[in-house]
């Protein structure tokens, strides 16, 4: 029985032969999280403006602001990764220098969701 795969570019397939769709998307998301949005990038092509929305200036004590940030992040992820059909983003923990998120995504042709727990600390997402 063949396992379902997600359509990816030829270059991606050549680099990641044998990697599961979940692992491939996880790696791509980690690249997204460790990149920044270009300021004033509204006029640039989408290929040049992918990146993580900045959260350091967000009031982490305000739930409405955190919900807004989750919506912005969700939109950025869905623009970046077309193999995600459904995505939920929620804040697990938020402090001045750290932010912990929970992501649950349904990928094309995959019966099981991809679940990620990701946290920002010491200048990078892990």
Swiss-Prot record:
Localization annotation: Cytoplasm
An annotated GO cellular component: cytoplasm
GO-annotated molecular function: anti-sigma factor antagonist activity
Top-rank taxon, per record: Bacteria
GO biological process: cellular response to oxidative stress; DNA damage response
tRNA-binding recorded as keyword: no
Keywords noted in UniProt: Cytoplasm, Stress response
Role noted for this protein: Inhibits RpoS proteolysis by regulating RssB activity, thereby increasing the stability of the sigma stress factor RpoS during oxidative stress. Its effect on RpoS stability is due to its interaction with RssB, which probably blocks the interaction of RssB with RpoS, and the consequent delivery of the RssB-RpoS complex to the ClpXP protein degradation pathway.
Subunit: Interacts with RssB.
Protein name: Anti-adapter protein IraD
